[in-house]
């Protein structure tokens, strides 16, 4: 299932997260605040019931499960060039660069447990950088997977959309959930919420700085 870039909207979010959609594009996030865990889970519940082995959630970006990652022939036939394993390790999905050594596939492993107490946030930026680099070429196609393709892999894809596609957490959830049934655990949602706060604050500060520079230029 192919999906294009989403229209930024918070119409289905909680009132505290609803954007007022002002005229100036640079003011879009002025009234945004990160929803709580329950409100975020409701966004997932409103998403697509579709849950197959693998689904495209953003152009050339797919979330899948262990079966997809282990199917070397299927990956090659589908044209995947990159694999991000969010369940790397002996006791999870034990693949790695050697597993794909005779294939034109670049591998990145994240050794993570699907537990609310596990700190997945330390992998947000490295994983997002790997995904972003993979999508830098129109010829590339990346699979992000864990065991079920619902929690760890979805969390890293959401972080990527927030970091490199300038989406809020709500926007990112809506984009992914309309294409695949996913649901990160409560701990991961809390970590994504913290990332959301940081990114929104950074954008507000950058916008404030730009506004100050423009005001100074007008005075000259």
Swiss-Prot record:
Residues 211-220 have a biased composition (Basic and acidic residues). One of its GO terms (biological process) is negative regulation of ERK1 and ERK2 cascade. It is found in: Cytoplasm; Nucleus. Its EC number is 3.1.3.16, 3.1.3.48. Substrate binds at residues 145-152. GO terms for molecular function: MAP kinase phosphatase activity; protein serine/threonine phosphatase activity; protein tyrosine phosphatase activity; protein tyrosine/serine/threonine phosphatase activity. It catalyses: O-phospho-L-tyrosyl-[protein] + H2O = L-tyrosyl-[protein] + phosphate; O-phospho-L-seryl-[protein] + H2O = L-seryl-[protein] + phosphate; O-phospho-L-threonyl-[protein] + H2O = L-threonyl-[protein] + phosphate. It comes from the Eukaryota. Signal peptide: none annotated. Keywords: Cytoplasm, Hydrolase, Nucleus, Protein phosphatase. Residues 53-201 form the Tyrosine-protein phosphatase domain. The active site is at 146 (phosphocysteine intermediate). One of its GO terms (cellular component) is cytoplasm. Residues 200-220 are annotated as: Disordered. Homodimer. Interacts with PRKAA2. Belongs to the protein-tyrosine phosphatase family. Non-receptor class dual specificity subfamily. Dual specificity phosphatase able to dephosphorylate phosphotyrosine, phosphoserine and phosphothreonine residues within the same substrate, with a preference for phosphotyrosine as a substrate. Involved in the modulation of AMPK and MAPK1/2 signaling pathways. This is Dual specificity phosphatase 29.
């Amino acid at each position: 299932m192919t999906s294009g870039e989403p229209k930024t909207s918070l119409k289905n979010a909680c009132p505290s997260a609803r954007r007022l959609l002002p005229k100036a594009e640079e003011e879009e996030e002025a009234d945004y605040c990160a929803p709580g865990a329950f409100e975020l889970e409701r966004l997932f519940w409103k998403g697509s019931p579709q849950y197959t082995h693998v689904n495209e959630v953003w152009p050339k970006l797919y979330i899948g499960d262990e079966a997809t990652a282990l199917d070397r022939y299927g990956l090659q036939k589908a044209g995947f060039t990159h694999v991000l394993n969010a369940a790397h390790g002996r006791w999870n999905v034990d693949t790695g660069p050697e597993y794909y050594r005779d294939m034109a596939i670049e591998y990145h492993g994240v050794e993570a447990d699907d537990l609310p107490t596990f700190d997945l946030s330390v992998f947000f930026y490295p994983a997002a950088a790997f995904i972003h680099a993979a999508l830098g070429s129109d010829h590339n196609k990346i699979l992000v997977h864990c065991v079920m393709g619902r929690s760890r892999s979805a969390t890293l894809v959401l972080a990527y959309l927030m970091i490199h596609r300038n989406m809020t957490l709500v926007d990112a959830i809506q984009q992914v959930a309309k294409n695949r049934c996913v649901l990160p655990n409560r701990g991961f949602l809390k970590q994504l919420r913290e990332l959301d706060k940081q990114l929104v604050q950074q954008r507000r500060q950058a916008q404030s700085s730009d506004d100050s520079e423009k005001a100074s230029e007008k005075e000259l």
